[in-house]
Amino acid sequence: MKGNVIVTPDFKRDVKKLLKKYPSLKSDLARLAADLFLNPKMGTQLSAHVYKIRLAIKSKGKGKSGGARVISYVDILTIEESDVYLLTIYDKSEFENISDKKLKELIQRIEDDLSDI
C-alpha cells in the first residue's frame, strides 16, 4: 500500500516547538515520511484510523523509547492508496501519553475536514 503524507496545522505548530530543541528532527521526519509512504499503517493502532508512531530523534540520543510520538490518521482511498495525515507530535519526555480528550479533538477536526471535501 502506498500513501500521501499530509501535514496538518496542529502538527506544524507542534513540530515547530520541537525543531528549536532538536536540530535532527527535520531529517528524522523526512525518514518517517518516506516510511509512511510505503507503509501508511505503521505504529500502534489507537482506533480505526489512528496510529501512534514511535520516532527516534537522533539529536536527542535516546532511541525510539525516549524520542517523540507522532499521531497519524490514515484515510484509505483505494486498496493500494491512502492519505496519511500527521495530526500531532510530542516529546515523550514532556508527555507520557496524549490525553483522550486531545486525541478526540484532533480526530474530530480531521474527520470534519475530510467530510467537507
Predicted regions and their residues:
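Enriched for short, Lys/Arg-rich terminal
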Residues: 74-117
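Arg/Lys-rich, positively charged N-terminal/basic patches that mediate binding to nucleic acids
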Residues: 1-29
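Basic/aromatic recognition patch in beta-strand/loop cores that engages polyanionic ligands
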Residues: 42-87
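Non-catalytic, surface-exposed connector residues within folded enzymatic/regulatory domains
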Residues: 5, 23-26, 47, 65, ...
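Compact soluble domain cores
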Residues: 24-42
